[in-house]
From Swiss-Prot:
InterPro entries attached to this UniProt entry: Isochorismatase-like_dom, Isochorismatase-like_sf, Isochorismatase_domain
Protein name (database record): Isochorismatase domain-containing protein 1
PANTHER family for the chain: HYDROLASE, ISOCHORISMATASE DOMAIN-CONTAINING PROTEIN 1
CDD domains in alphabetical order: YcaC_related (cd01012)
Annotated family: Belongs to the isochorismatase family.
Lineage of origin: Eukaryota, Metazoa, Chordata, Craniata, Vertebrata
SUPFAM superfamilies from the UniProt entry: Isochorismatase-like hydrolases
One protein family per Pfam: Isochorismatase
Length: 283
């Protein structure tokens, strides 16, 4: 089907960016993520990905563009535009427990022989899970095709996890996770760790970023089969505005003060340094 024409499954849309406007079509029921990808496919070379953007919908009632309503999905012919925010947004990376959620991605038994330094990233991941329980931070856990790849490794204690769900898609940003996030309306920061860095982690991070979340990628709790894949994925994520950090930095930022009532418990977690695994020094 040519762009600009509709059938039973697609509707025509006019997509505008800067001085350009192009007719296209999208499937009925398309939401924010599909529209973002459509804009990027049409105007990717002109869009500065270091800036923050928003989608606006043309309103016949108001005869002007308005911010895309929350939960908007395409149901009929419409006009949309992709506009930068007035100023570049500096990502400060501040973390507080009340607005933070942890995403633990696919730390499963069948990956153990293949993933570089798997034992070390599990050890660090367990620290993060323990810290989340102490600080009352929700944890969302995914398992990639558990029927074939097994469940989350036994070393990682998922007690109190808000959601543990199976998936086949690489990204964790699926209806189950989005529903859990919708029940946490104050959350703006996601701390992400797991495997593989260049596949499920990267796709999850980019999907979260597209939805307006501030993403903190825990470098000492993520790895891949190939260290080169891992290295380039971390570099790409950092360039798109994802904060690449470490587990100790995350935990201490969340308490923020030695007078915090939970500081001693967090201190006990990090007394022994995280494993010097070679994740940084070896490609």
């Amino acid at each position: 089907m040519a762009d600009g024409h509709s059938n039973n499954n697609h509707v025509p849309v006019l997509l505008s960016f800067s001085a350009f406007s192009r007719p296209s079509s999208v499937p009925v029921g398309s939401g924010y993520e599909v529209l973002i990808q459509k804009f990027l496919s049409l105007y990717g070379r002109q869009i500065d990905l270091h800036r923050k953007f928003m989608i606006q919908l043309y309103s016949d009632e108001w005869a002007q563009y308005i911010d895309l309503p929350k939960g908007f999905i395409i149901s009929e012919k419409c006009k949309l535009r992709f506009v930068p925010l007035e100023t570049d947004v500096t990502i400060l990376g501040n973390l507080i427990p009340a607005t933070t959620v942890f995403f633990c991605c696919d730390m499963q038994e069948r990956f153990r022989p293949a993933i570089k330094y798997f034992g070390d990233i599990i050890s660090v991941g367990q620290r993060l899970l323990q810290g989340a329980r102490i600080l009352g931070i929700p944890v969302i856990v995914s398992e990639q095709y558990p029927k074939g790849l097994g469940n989350t490794v036994q070393e990682m204690d998922l007690t109190g996890a808000r959601l543990v769900f199976p998936k086949t898609k690489f990204s964790m940003v699926l209806p189950e996770a989005e529903a859990a996030l919708a029940e946490l309306p104050g959350v703006r920061s996601v701390v992400l760790f797991g495997v593989e860095t260049h596949v499920c982690i990267q796709q999850t991070a980019l999907d979260l970023l597209a939805r307006g979340f501030e993403v903190h990628m825990v470098a000492d709790s993520t790895s891949s089969r190939s260290m080169m894949d891992r290295m380039f994925a971390l570099d790409r994520m950092a360039r798109t505005g994802i904060i690449v950090t470490t587990s100790e930095s995350i935990l201490l930022q969340l308490v923020g003060d030695k007078e915090h009532p939970k500081f001693k418990e967090i201190q006990n977690i990090i007394k022994a340094s995280a494993p010097e695994s070679g994740l940084l020094s070896k490609v």
